C-alpha cells in the first residue's frame, strides 16, 4: 500500500476494527509477521528481567496474558487521566498480563500493543501513543491532585516514571513504556505497592528495564528489524 493510499484508508481501517473486532487472519502463536491478529508469546519481556524477580519469581507474562480492547496504561488509572480523542489504542491488537500479590507486596502489569499493517504507519502510531503518555503524566496532578509524578526517562521511544499517591492508602508506581516503530508496537511494564512496601525497590537503571521490554519485539514480530 502506498503512503497516499494508506492515508486515504485510515478511516476505513478504524471503522473495520470497530465493526468487526478482532481480525480474521491467523498466525503462529510464538511469532507473528507484521500483520498479526494477536500478541505472540515471544514478544513479552523475559520474566527474569522484571524488577524483583529474585523475590517474586515472576512467571512468564505470555502464560497469563489476556486479549484486551481499548487498553490503557496503569498510570492513567491512578492519575484519573481523561480519555483522548481518536486514541490509536482503540484499534490496536493488545494483551495484558496482571500478576497480583497480597496487599503490601508489589503488583505487576505488563501490556503489549500492536498496530497491524504497514510498519511505517504502525510505527507512527506507536510513537504518537508514547508522546501522549508523556503529556498525560505531566498533567497527572491536574486530574489527581494527590499524586506526585516524576518522569525519570523521557527519550524518543522510551518513557519511565515514578508516581507517588498520598492519602489514606499511599501508593508508589514505577512505570516503564517503550515504542518500537520497526514493528508498530508499544510495551508497558508497571509495578506498584502500598508505601512503605514489604520489599524495597531495587537500585536498577531505567535503561535496563526499557531495554528488556523492547528486546523481544524484533523476535516476536518477524522481519520487523531487518
Question: Could you tell me what each predicted segment is?
Answer:
Residues 36, 116-119, 167-169, 195:
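Residues that cap or initiate secondary-structure elements
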Residues 91-127:
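A short acidic-to-branched-hydrophobic micro-motif
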Residues 57, 64-65, 70, 74, ...:
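Short Gly/Thr-rich strand-loop-strand
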Residues 145-226:
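A short, solvent-exposed beta-edge/loop patch
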Residues 123-130, 210-214:
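Extracytoplasmic/secreted envelope proteins and their assembly/folding machinery
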Residues 1-27:
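Secretory targeting and sorting signals
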Residues 28-96, 226:
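N-terminal "mature-domain start" segment
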Residues 21, 30, 73, 134, ...:
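Processing junctions and N-termini across compartments
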Amino acid at each position: 500500500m502506498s503512503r497516499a493510499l494508506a492515508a486515504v484508508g485510515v478511516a476505513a481501517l478504524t471503522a473495520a476494527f470497530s465493526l468487526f473486532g478482532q481480525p480474521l487472519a491467523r498466525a503462529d502463536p510464538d511469532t507473528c509477521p507484521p500483520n498479526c491478529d494477536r500478541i505472540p508469546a515471544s514478544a513479552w519481556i523475559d520474566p527474569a528481567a522484571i524488577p524483583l524477580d529474585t523475590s517474586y519469581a515472576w512467571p512468564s507474562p505470555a502464560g497469563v496474558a489476556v486479549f484486551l480492547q481499548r487498553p490503557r496504561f496503569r498510570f492513567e488509572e491512578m492519575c484519573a487521566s481523561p480519555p483522548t480523542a481518536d486514541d490509536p489504542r482503540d484499534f490496536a491488537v493488545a494483551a495484558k498480563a496482571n500478576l497480583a500479590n497480597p496487599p503490601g507486596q508489589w503488583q505487576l502489569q505488563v501490556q503489549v500493543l500492536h498496530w497491524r499493517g504497514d510498519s511505517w504507519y504502525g510505527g507512527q502510531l506507536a510513537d504518537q501513543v508514547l508522546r501522549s503518555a508523556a503529556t498525560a503524566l505531566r498533567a497527572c496532578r491536574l486530574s489527581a491532585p494527590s499524586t506526585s509524578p516524576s518522569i525519570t526517562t523521557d527519550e524518543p521511544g522510551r518513557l519511565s516514571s515514578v508516581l507517588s499517591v498520598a492519602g489514606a492508602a499511599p501508593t508508589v508506581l514505577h512505570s516503564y513504556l517503550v515504542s518500537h516503530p520497526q514493528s508498530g508496537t508499544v510495551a508497558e511494564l508497571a509495578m506498584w505497592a502500598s508505601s512503605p512496601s514489604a520489599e524495597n525497590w531495587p537500585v536498577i537503571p531505567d535503561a535496563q528495564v526499557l531495554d528488556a521490554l523492547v528486546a523481544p519485539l524484533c523476535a516476536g514480530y518477524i522481519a520487523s528489524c531487518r
